[in-house]
C-alpha cells in the first residue's frame, strides 16, 4: 500500500511540474521579450530558445554571437527550421566532443617515447 502511495505521489508531482512548466506565464514573457525585430532569424532565435527550453540560466549573449555568425554566413533560418538548426548544432558539437575524446584516448595509448 505504501509503495502504491509513493508511486501515485511521484506521478502527481511529475504531472504538476510539467504542467506548471508549460503554462508558466513568466516563461512566455521571457521569450516574447527577446523578440527585437521582425527579422526571420530573430524569430528563429526565439523559436530555438522555446524548443531548447527557456530558463534564466541560458547564456543569451553567447546565443546572440552564434546568430550573428550565422547572419554573416548568409544563413537565414525561418522559425520552422529553428528546431532543425538546434538539432544540427547539437549533433556537430557532439561530433566534435567525440573526435576530441578519441584523440585524447589515442594520445594516452601511445607510449611517451613514440609521441611527436
UniProtKB/Swiss-Prot annotation:
Stated family: Belongs to the RxLR effector family.
This protein's name: Secreted RxLR effector protein 9
Motif annotated as RxLR-dEER, chain positions: 49-64
Triggers of expression: Expression is up-regulated at later stages of infection.
GO cellular component, one term: host cell nucleus
Compartment(s) of residence: Secreted; Host cytoplasm; Host nucleus
Gene: RxLR9
Keywords linked to the UniProt accession: Host cytoplasm, Host nucleus, Secreted, Signal, Virulence
InterPro entries to which the protein is assigned, alphabetical: RXLR
Amino acid at each position: 500500500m505504501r509503495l502504491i502511495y509513493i508511486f501515485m505521489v511521484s506521478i502527481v508531482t511529475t504531472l504538476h511540474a510539467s504542467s506548471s512548466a508549460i503554462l508558466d506565464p513568466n516563461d512566455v514573457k521571457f521569450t516574447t521579450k527577446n523578440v527585437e525585430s521582425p527579422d526571420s532569424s530573430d524569430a528563429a532565435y526565439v523559436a530555438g530558445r522555446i524548443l531548447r527550453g527557456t530558463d534564466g540560466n541560458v547564456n543569451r549573449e553567447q546565443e546572440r554571437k552564434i546568430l550573428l555568425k550565422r547572419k554573416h554566413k548568409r544563413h537565414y533560418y525561418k522559425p520552422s527550421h529553428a528546431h532543425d538548426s538546434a538539432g544540427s548544432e547539437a549533433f556537430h558539437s557532439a561530433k566534435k566532443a567525440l573526435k576530441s575524446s578519441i584523440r585524447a584516448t589515442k594520445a594516452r595509448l601511445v607510449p611517451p617515447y613514440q609521441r611527436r
